[in-house]
Design a protein with these regions (language model features):
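Bacterial N-terminal signal peptides that target proteins for export
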Residues: 2-13
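Enzymes and membrane/adaptor proteins characterized by extended Gly/Ser/Thr/Asp/Glu-rich
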Residues: 64-78, 86-196
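A generic local structural motif
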Residues: 4-5, 17, 82-84
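Structural motif corresponding to alpha-helix initiation and N-cap regions
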Residues: 39, 78-82
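Sec-dependent signal peptide cleavage junction
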Residues: 20-37
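Hydrophobic alpha-helical targeting segments used for export or membrane insertion
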Residues: 11-22
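Mature N-terminal segment immediately following signal peptide/propeptide cleavage
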Residues: 38-68, 89
Length: 196
């Protein structure tokens, strides 16, 4: 009985946290100056895309390791090569997710994200849609960047009961990722730590 009560409590608590945390984003998201103009641009672009391109826009591969013909074995993918650049150009992916293997140093990461975007926007098919460059930089034990500010994880932030601490942590992570050319962070998450 106690186990079911605890599960219900945790589910209710997580639902409440997610609802309350979404309220804080209302003030951050500004309305577009002209929503009709944005819709028109998107509709125009979509009308020119093939079905294959539309499907590819929903795909987000990772390139953690790569082995070119001249390599003796797989290596962490940290520097753009001709093979990956051609894949990005040919397939019109919607994004690429980066992991620790990709983001060792600040300068290296910025160069890689710049090269990925250049490959995505230099195609000859006319779509030239920039990539969503993503990562799951949550803080705590889920820390992908090889350099940057080490911040506490969600459990530690929650223990402080400080919305200011959580906000500051999110802002630091957001600024650092943006400076590296990463435009989506799959965080924070509503993980339940089942093995503390």
């Amino acid at each position: 009985m106690k186990k079911n009560t605890l599960k219900r409590f945790m589910a209710s608590a997580m639902t409440a946290v997610m609802c309350v945390s979404s309220l804080g984003t209302l003030a951050v998201n500004a309305a577009p100056a002209d929503p009709a103009a944005e819709t028109s641009v998107v509709d125009n672009l979509m009308s020119k895309m093939t079905l294959r391109q539309k499907i590819a826009q929903m795909m987000m591969p990772d390139f953690r390791k790569w082995q070119t013909e001249s390599d003796s074995g797989q290596k962490n993918f940290q520097v753009m090569n001709d093979e990956v650049a051609q894949i990005i150009k040919d397939y019109d992916f919607g994004g690429v997710i980066l992991f620790a293997e990709n983001v060792a140093q600040t300068d290296q990461t910025l160069k890689l994200t710049t090269d990925l975007q250049e490959a995505a926007t230099s195609g000859t098919d006319g779509s030239n849609i920039p990539l969503l460059l993503t990562i799951d930089q949550e803080g705590g034990i889920v820390y992908r960047l090889g350099s940057g500010t080490a911040l506490p994880g969600n459990m530690a932030l929650g223990a402080t009961r400080s919305t200011d601490a959580a906000t500051q942590s999110g802002e630091v992570i957001g600024r650092e990722l943006s400076a590296l050319g990463i435009n989506v962070d799959f965080a924070p998450v509503a993980d339940v730590n089942s093995n503390p």
